[in-house]
Structures are given as C-alpha cells and as structure tokens.
C-alpha cells in the first residue's frame, strides 16, 4: 500500500490553500465493473502534458485505459487494477519530473 502513501504525498504537495478547493483526486467504481481514477493536473507539473487515450485489453475482464488531456489524468480499469492505475500515474509523474529537473539543471 505504499502507493497510497505516495498519492497522499503528491496530493499534499499540490495543496496550496487554493488548489484543493477546485481540484483533486477522484476514485470511483464503474459499472463495467471496475475503477475510475481522475486526477486534476491544473497548476501542477503535468498541467500541459497531453497523452492520447490508450486502451490495453488482454481479455474482457483484464483491461485498463488512460489519457491525460484538458489538464486531467483519466484512467479506468477492471476490478483488479486500482493500485495499478495509481502506479501508472506515479510513473508518469516521475517521468515528467525527471525531464523538469534536468531542464532546471541546464
């Protein structure tokens, strides 16, 4: 469950007294069945990132999809994919964080 701690830290880092009043993290169940994860990215490092929707469907019961557009990470997956979807978001944050940090060092 370390990924939940990581998400808590990411959320806390972005709470600045204003951001959390309009933006945040939403985790819901969907009727496929499965999970939906929406994470607002306005005023964050990923605000201007765009990733086209990608659906990875191994079987009817083993699937997930995700995108980043309109300053939001949107992902959904089968009932076993909740932690995976959060890990996926973490990997995207870390990828762009590395790019951002390297640009700062130039």
For the regions a protein language model found, what residue spans apply to each?
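Helix-rich interaction surfaces within compact, conserved domain-sized segments
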Residues: 56-102
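Eukaryotic proteins' extreme N-terminal regulatory segments
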Residues: 1-16
């Amino acid at each position: 469950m370390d990924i939940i701690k990581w998400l808590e830290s990411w959320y806390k880092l972005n709470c600045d007294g204003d951001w959390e009043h309009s933006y945040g993290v939403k985790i819901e169940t969907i009727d496929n069945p499965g999970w939906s994860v929406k994470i607002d990215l306005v005023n964050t490092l990923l605000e201007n990132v765009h990733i086209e929707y990608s659906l990875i469907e191994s079987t009817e019961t083993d699937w997930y999809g995700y995108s980043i557009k309109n300053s939001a990470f949107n992902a959904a997956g089968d009932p076993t994919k909740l932690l995976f979807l959060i890990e996926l978001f973490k990997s995207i944050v870390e990828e762009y964080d590395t790019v951002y940090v390297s640009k700062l060092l130039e």
